[in-house]
Every structure is written in C-alpha cells, then in structure tokens.
Regions:
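Two-component/phosphorelay signaling modules centered on CheY-like receiver
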Residues: 12-30, 96
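Residue-level signal for the "D+5" position in two-component response regulator receiver
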Residues: 31, 56-59
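Acidic, metal-coordinating helix/loop segments flanking the phosphotransfer/catalytic sites
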Residues: 31-49
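Acidic catalytic/metal-coordinating carboxylates
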Residues: 34, 60-63
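Active-site residues of response regulator receiver
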Residues: 53
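Short amphipathic alpha-helix used as the core "switch/output" element in two-component signaling
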Residues: 62-73
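C-terminal output helix
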Residues: 103-112
Length: 113
C-alpha cells in the first residue's frame, strides 16, 4: 500500500516541486493551499505524513497541531516555514519535526529513503 502525503502550504511552486518529488517515489500526494481545505483533506484522506506550513492565508498552521495530534496521534508531522526557527516550536512528540525553508534535496533524500 502506498503511503499518503498531505502538503498544506500556500506556495504553489513549493507544492508542485514536493508533489513531483514524492510522486516519483510512489507516494500518493494531496495538496491544500489553506488550513480549511487542509483539515478537510486530513479528515478524508487519513495521510501518513503531513507537511504543514505556518504562514497560511487563513491563519497559522502550527496552531492546529494539537488538534491534529489528538485526532491522528501516529501521523508524522513536518512543520515548515521560511520565517520561523526550530526553537519557535518546541515539542517532545517524536512524530513532529521542524524544517526551515528552503528544504534541501539532501534532507528529503535522507529522511525519505
């Protein structure tokens, strides 16, 4: 069974690149450009991995992390932002990591072998 990735980010170019990268590696990829659409897809698709940007048109994505973790505790969440640093979101949950944009291809390759 193919793993599903949900990307919630308003940067169309970033989403296009990420979608292409993961589709070539046999992942199913869903994209939402705002929190509202992302939450709907999260509920409907039950992804294995979530890329969640913080600065979205309809709010701060990271504020939804507690709700997401409560609903899907096994979900691997990768919080991404060009404007924040890892210290801005501190968690002890091993399923949550923080990546700063731009994301390097080396980091993607190492994380998703």
């Amino acid at each position: 069974m193919r793993k599903k990735i949900l990307i919630i980010d308003d940067e169309v170019d970033f989403c296009t690149i990420m979608k292409g990268y993961f589709k070539k590696r046999n992942y199913d990829v869903l994209v939402a450009y705002n929190i509202k659409a992302g939450i709907v897809l999260l509920d409907e698709a039950n992804p294995d991995i979530l890329f969640l940007d913080n600065n979205l048109p309809d709010g701060e994505g990271w504020k939804f992390v507690p709700r997401i973790v409560e609903k899907s505790p096994q979900l691997k969440i990768i919080l991404i932002s060009a404007h924040l640093h890892k210290a801005d979101f501190v968690t002890t949950n091993e399923n949550i990591v923080v990546w700063e944009k731009p994301i390097s291809m080396e980091l993607l390759k190492e994380t998703f072998k």
